Amino acid sequence: MSSALIADNIAKVRETIAECAEKSGRLAADVTLVGVCKYFGEEVTRMVAEAGLLDLGENRPQQLWDKALSLDTLPIRWHQIGHLQRNKVRRSLPFIHLFHAGGSMRLLVEINKEAERVQATQEVLLEINGLKLMHLEEK
């Protein structure tokens, strides 16, 4: 995969986002494009970031940690997508711009506890299923 092909594909997706945003009366700037790099190694991930796509998602914490450390000279905003085990929150938090995995109260409490410990504010997307709201109730 070449840098030129990656940059061209990103540009095409951004054009589509701009067209759709305009049709819906929104601004393209209000839409965040997140490139999911879970099947790609460091080299391709670097090319994506160098092409200007700086919001990158990974669903495997170990790979996210490794990529974040090896690509730390690039201003990448890392997104943890998918499930995250509570025991990996402490190690993950320093790298994560946005958690897309707020599906359980126990995980949310752990993220909040760790964020408070390091005096940070952590953004999280909540997953809410109307049929399963009892999972968010405190017991």
What does each of the following model-derived ranges do?
Residues 1-139:
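Conserved alpha/beta-domain cores
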